[in-house]
UniProtKB/Swiss-Prot annotation:
<protein>
    <recommendedName>
        <fullName>Endonuclease V</fullName>
        <ecNumber>3.1.21.7</ecNumber>
    </recommendedName>
</protein>
<comment type="similarity">
    <text>Belongs to the endonuclease V family.</text>
</comment>
<keyword id="KW-0255">Endonuclease</keyword>
<keyword id="KW-0460">Magnesium</keyword>
<dbReference type="GO" id="GO:0005737">
    <property type="term" value="C:cytoplasm"/>
</dbReference>
<feature type="site" description="Interaction with target DNA">
    <location>
        <position position="73"/>
    </location>
</feature>
<dbReference type="GO" id="GO:0006281">
    <property type="term" value="P:DNA repair"/>
</dbReference>
<dbReference type="GO" id="GO:0043737">
    <property type="term" value="F:deoxyribonuclease V activity"/>
</dbReference>
<keyword id="KW-0540">Nuclease</keyword>
<keyword id="KW-0227">DNA damage</keyword>
<dbReference type="InterPro" id="IPR007581">
    <property type="entry name" value="Endonuclease-V"/>
</dbReference>
<feature type="binding site">
    <location>
        <position position="35"/>
    </location>
    <ligand>
        <name>Mg(2+)</name>
    </ligand>
</feature>
<dbReference type="GO" id="GO:0016891">
    <property type="term" value="F:RNA endonuclease activity, producing 5'-phosphomonoesters"/>
</dbReference>
<keyword id="KW-0378">Hydrolase</keyword>
<keyword id="KW-0963">Cytoplasm</keyword>
<feature type="binding site">
    <location>
        <position position="103"/>
    </location>
    <ligand>
        <name>Mg(2+)</name>
    </ligand>
</feature>
<comment type="function">
    <text>DNA repair enzyme involved in the repair of deaminated bases. Selectively cleaves double-stranded DNA at the second phosphodiester bond 3' to a deoxyinosine leaving behind the intact lesion on the nicked DNA.</text>
</comment>
Length: 223
């Protein structure tokens, strides 16, 4: 594995990320969610894509793709491991979203190219990274109240907002992926909350990928 080459690719791609608001449709008619997981001891990469109507946030379509994993787990290089399955799921959607939430980092990455940014560049869609853990940077400790907020800073640059979306839950790291500003990323996530820790697009993507009860109930209603 030539990590030096991958690192150089990340730096080059990161220079093409658009950190300004460039939505083709604002407000969006459809918002997507993406989540990646692994099966069979990491041998298979599974990606789930969901499509929600906006502003109702009603689930209208989902796709799951499973492909052979082509790269081992290497911190800082996860997007190279995850994007092939994401692309396979994306290509199955009959309707593409106007805005995509990705479970993972955007520019809040040591080389400013998390999976939300990498995938956003690949398909040229506005993306937001919604991560559950810090990858780089520092932030001031948050109060326990829901809504507590702090900028994630690295080398004098704001990479994300750290936001406690729900009481007694760890905060989310919300960042530009591509074609969405940092402040707008936070605002869009806040518009897509329904009382859970995660915004609806990535919550549904996780539910579909993992076969959670909410998704099972949704399937039963559709029959």
């Amino acid at each position: 594995m030539d990590l030096a080459s991958l690192r150089a690719q990340q730096i080059e791609l990161a220079s093409s990320v658009c950190r300004e608001d460039r939505l083709d449709k604002d407000p969006p008619a459809f918002i997507g969610g993406a989540d990646v997981g692994f099966e069979q001891g990491g041998e298979v990469t599974r990606a789930a894509m969901v499509l929600l109507k906006y502003p109702s946030l009603e689930l209208v379509e989902y796709k799951v793709a499973r492909i052979a994993t082509t790269m081992p787990y290497i911190p800082g290089f996860l997007s190279f491991r995850e994007y092939p399955a994401l692309l396979a799921a994306w290509e199955q959607l009959s309707q593409k979203p106007d805005l995509l939430f990705v479970d993972g980092h955007g520019i809040s990455h040591p080389r400013r190219l998390g999976v939300a940014s990498h995938f956003g560049l690949l398909v040229d869609v506005p993306t937001i990274g919604v991560a559950k853990k810090r990858l780089c940077g520092k932030f001031e400790p948050l109060s326990a109240e829901p809504g507590a907020l702090s900028p994630l800073m690295d080398k004098g640059e704001q990479l994300a907002w750290v936001w406690r979306s729900k009481a007694r839950c760890n905060p989310l790291f919300i960042a530009t992926g591509h074609r969405v500003s940092t402040d707008s990323a936070l605002a869009w996530v806040q518009r897509c909350m329904k009382g859970y820790r995660l915004p609806e697009p990535t919550r549904w993507a996780d539910a579909v990928a993992s076969g959670r009860p909410a998704f099972v109930r949704w399937q039963e209603i559709q029959r």
